[in-house]
Curated annotation (Swiss-Prot):
One of its GO terms (biological process) is 'de novo' pyrimidine nucleobase biosynthetic process. InterPro entries: Asp/Orn_carbamoyltranf_P-bd, Asp/Orn_carbamoylTrfase, Asp/Orn_carbamoylTrfase_sf, Asp_carbamoyltransf, Asp_carbamoyltransf_Asp/Orn-bd. Carbamoyl phosphate binds at R59, T60, R109, H139, Q142, A265, P266. GO terms for cellular component: cytosol. Keywords: Pyrimidine biosynthesis, Transferase. It is an enzyme of class 2 (transferase). One of its GO terms (molecular function) is aspartate carbamoyltransferase activity. This is Aspartate carbamoyltransferase catalytic subunit.
Length: 310
């Protein structure tokens, strides 16, 4: 991984741990250039991408597809139920096969954390791996689009007060963001049920009372309650969660006028956030979705640049 002549070069993108501040800023600025229509890009040769999603997805899956098409890539959509996965073939053997067929980039989402390790460490798999989310592990492309959205608003990260609120333990978005936001100089707070907080997060910020810190925040980043990753009896009722931990209309009045509201979506309206706030003037939730296409264009361009530089 490196930055040359202002362009990032990546072999793979699996975790925010693997990215430097320079690479992150390079990707954000390149995504902004794509958004502004000021980025020149042309493929040198036919390039194939395949999107392998083993967990449901709307935003990540479709924005990667659109990004790939905008860059001129040939996209092979992958249906796990119609593939040899349904016959017992492993993910490794599936990617090995796609690589042998000539696929250049595999975008993968899996419920298995760190699934990508055996793929990127294989001597026989040469296609680039882009992690579209691995269980409760990492979600680097979501983190980068979140960072782009924050940077568009404030033009900096240093000194910003940011709260990440909700289902922290089960959220790959939270883990990717806390890791990089701290590195970029933001001051982080974590709020939500104590049962969904881990002491390992103390390395990045502080567990806080939401009502006390709301007036100080520049960014309030809400997280979806991930019922599908909970043990039985671990979840709250929708009404109870919204009352005690959600961004209600009354709590939103405590935010500074310049503060922004974010959520990686899908949104559980009237659970994490009041329905009326999802598309409110302070919300950047729709902007995050739009930025996902441009961020993923920048990621794919960096992957292609990395392959070319080999």
């Amino acid at each position: 991984m490196s930055v040359k002549n202002g362009l990032v070069q990546l072999e793979n993108l699996t975790s925010m741990e693997n990215l430097s501040v320079d690479e992150v800023m390079g990707l954000i600025k390149r995504a902004s250039a794509f958004k502004a229509g000021k980025a020149d890009f042309a493929l040198d040769e036919q390039t194939f991408a395949s999107n392998l999603f083993f967990e449901n997805s709307t935003r990540t899956h479709h924005s990667f597809h659109i990004a790939e098409r905008k860059l001129g890539l040939d996209v092979l959509e992958f249906d796990a139920q119609a593939s040899s996965i349904s016959k017992g073939e492993t993910l490794y053997d599936t990617v090995l096969t796609l690589d042998a067929l000539g696929v250049d980039i595999c975008v993968i989402r899996s419920g298995v954390e760190h699934y990508y390790e055996e793929l990127v460490n294989s001597d026989n798999i040469h296609c680039a791996i882009v992690n579209g989310g691995d269980g409760s592990g990492q979600h680097p492309s979501q983190c980068l689009l979140d960072l782009m959205t924050i940077y568009e608003e404030f033009g900096k990260f240093e000194g910003l007060k940011i709260a990440i609120s909700g289902d922290l333990t089960h959220s790959r978005v939270a883990k990717s963001n806390m890791m990089m936001l701290q590195k970029l100089g933001a001051r982080l707070y974590f709020t939500g049920p104590a049962a969904w907080y881990s002491e390992e997060f103390d390395d990045y910020g502080h567990y806080a009372n939401l009502d006390r810190i709301l007036p100080e925040l520049d960014v309030h980043m809400l997280l979806r309650v991930q019922h599908e990753r909970h043990d039985s009896g671990e979840s709250f009722s929708k009404e109870g969660y919204h009352t005690h931990f959600g961004l209600t209309q009354e709590r939103a009045k405590m935010l500074k006028p310049t503060a922004i509201i974010m959520h990686p979506a899908p949104v559980n309206r009237d659970v994490e956030i009041a329905d009326s706030l999802v598309e409110s003037p302070q919300s950047r939730i729709v902007q995050q979705m739009s930025n996902g296409v441009y961020t993923r264009m920048a990621i794919l361009e960096a992957i292609l640049a990395g392959k070319k530089a080999k």
